[in-house]
Amino acid sequence: DEHPHFSWHPGMLVPDCHMQTVFLKDLVSAVAPTNPYSFVNYLVKHKKFYRFLTSRLRTVSREEFSDYLRWAAEDMNNLYFSHTVENIDFDKKRRLFLVQTSQGEYFARNICLGTGKQPYLPPCVKHMTQSCFHASEMNLRRPDLSGKRITVVGGGQSGADLFLNALRGEWGEAAEINWVSRRNNFNALDEAAFADEYFTPEYISGFSGLEEDIRHQLLDEQKMTSDGITADSLLTIYRELYHRFEVLRKPRNIRLLPSRSVTTLESSGPGWKLLMEHHLDQGRESLESDVVIFATGYRSALPQILPSLMPLITMHDKNTFKVRDDFTLEWSGPKENNIFVVNASMQTHGIAEPQLSLMAWRSARILNRVMGRDLFDLSMPPALIQWRSGT
């Protein structure tokens, strides 16, 4: 890893920001619950098991989950930080991958790519500045918002977390706060019991065999199971607004602006002018803001360290890998050498693939393939829902 030490989304570790998945969906518990790197063992080792239970938390804060991951990482002796991977090639004589880093070279029979996604900004954003940036950098920048007009763009969980903290004055008391979303409302995360079935190995098994157009349709239908806002967050925001305006009778300096896309962003004096288009009535509006924060999600991006291997890799299209069920890429090298990839195959593995929900199962699937045997028992119980026909 190129970073000097372990850090998990440090820019989004803002106060009162919680995970969307239950704490048992940790590094190991789903496949090896007695493994010492379980979240429960983390609680025991830190002498807070009973207080955690008394707190009755179904989900934990992002700060605590980050601390759990850091604790696990610091106990492992095979993690190398401050190592920037510069190129990966395949040595035909050794029949091994050659990983070239800023600190030296490594040979491996198999490699796993986990470089993740890149922050997405709308096309109208030409570059980031101190007053216009992506939400993933909020806690790294910690700007002073005192007396400023603030606009948060994005109607998902990250947008909600930033809006709530700005509302509470976490970075100073703002003069005005706007929350803009393309969606027609600030929609809740779908946490229904049967929706959670999308985040199971059984569902992935059925999903991956469907035709491509059907998979795309299903991903669109299931979007709110991963991209919505938790009911707790929405209720907290609503109560904050009620208390501020109906009880304290403060000036209404908050604007909630759904059904709008930011089409143009222009510098305007020390701040910014946003031009927006309303999806439902086709109206056009402008908005002046001193600070604009884009909570607009992430985009898939091919790793920049693969120019030597790319001619050997079979692509689904120019920006998407062709990924098998066991998370290996199709490539023209020896069959005993595998290129695994994670967080890069939602189109084939379903809505759960980029999420933490199946992290332990996915890792076990990869390790079983590497070892050539079932190191972990991943056999599935009878399905609760018959996702596919019997034909």
Where are these regions (language model features)?
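Flavin (primarily FAD) cofactor-binding/catalytic cores of flavoenzymes
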Residues: 1-4, 8-11, 52-157, 161-391
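A conserved beta-strand/loop capping segment in the N-terminal third of enzymes
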Residues: 31-63
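N-terminal low-complexity, Ser/Thr- and acidic-residue-enriched intrinsically disordered segments
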Residues: 1-29
